[in-house]
Design a protein with these regions (language model features):
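A short, internal acetyl-CoA/4′-phosphopantetheine-binding micro-motif in the GNAT/acyltransferase core
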Residues: 113-123, 149
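A conserved beta-turn-beta hairpin within the catalytic core of GNAT-like acetyltransferases
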Residues: 103-112, 121, 173
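Conserved acetyl-CoA-binding loop-helix of GNAT-fold acetyltransferases
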Residues: 122-137, 157, 161
Length: 183
């Protein structure tokens, strides 16, 4: 019943926009990020996002499966007002070096996710993107959460480096369900 989930997503998008849209219109990232541009995915061509995801190695998807990566799925996300997603673009090359999002809900929760391009790992970009997600999420009044697997060392370190966290649950698959706390 994918149509039912699509309907729920559309309803959530409308309700989220009614509740948080005015705050999002006023929001601007406070911290300038030298050498990078932060662009909402609605302003990025769908094929550029699909190409970014296709460029990542299979191991990048072992712990990262938040949505489909095909053109139709990406286009649907771009139209969803509750899916606060951005890319980080390196100014010198124009390359997308990271993708990050808060999957948000009208009742006030958001779930963080991010992916750093394979060629840009180990530079602190994941931690930077987490800080940006905190900035937008907390500024509009969301409670933020994340699931992260301790076996995914880079993502785990990024989550705890960027934020004060509270472990809500240790899940059977090894994931930790974290609440991101305002510092």
């Amino acid at each position: 019943m994918p149509w039912a989930w699509n309907l729920v997503d559309q309803l959530n998008s409308v309700l989220f926009s009614l509740r948080y849209g005015h705050k999002l219109k006023k929001f601007r990232f406070k911290t300038p990020h030298k050498n990078y541009q932060i662009i909402p995915i609605c302003n990025i061509p769908t094929d550029a996002l699909v190409k970014f995801f296709a460029h990542q190695p299979n191991e990048a998807y072992k712990f990262f499966r938040p949505h489909g990566f095909d053109p139709k799925s990406i286009q649907r996300l771009k139209e969803n007002k509750a899916f606060l997603a951005y890319v980080l673009i390196e100014e010198s090359s124009g390359h997308i070096v990271g993708y990050f999002f808060n999957r948000s809900f009208f009742h006030g929760k958001g779930f963080r996710g991010r992916m750093v391009d394979i060629n840009y790992r180990g530079r602190g970009i994941g931690t930077m993107m987490n800080c940006l997600l905190n900035e937008v999420g907390f500024s509009i009044g969301l409670r933020l959460f994340e699931t992260v697997n301790k076996n995914n060392e880079a993502s785990y370190k990024s989550a705890i480096s960027a934020s004060k966290v509270k472990v809500i649950d240790k899940m059977a698959n090894g994931d930790l369900y974290l609440e991101i706390l305002i510092i």
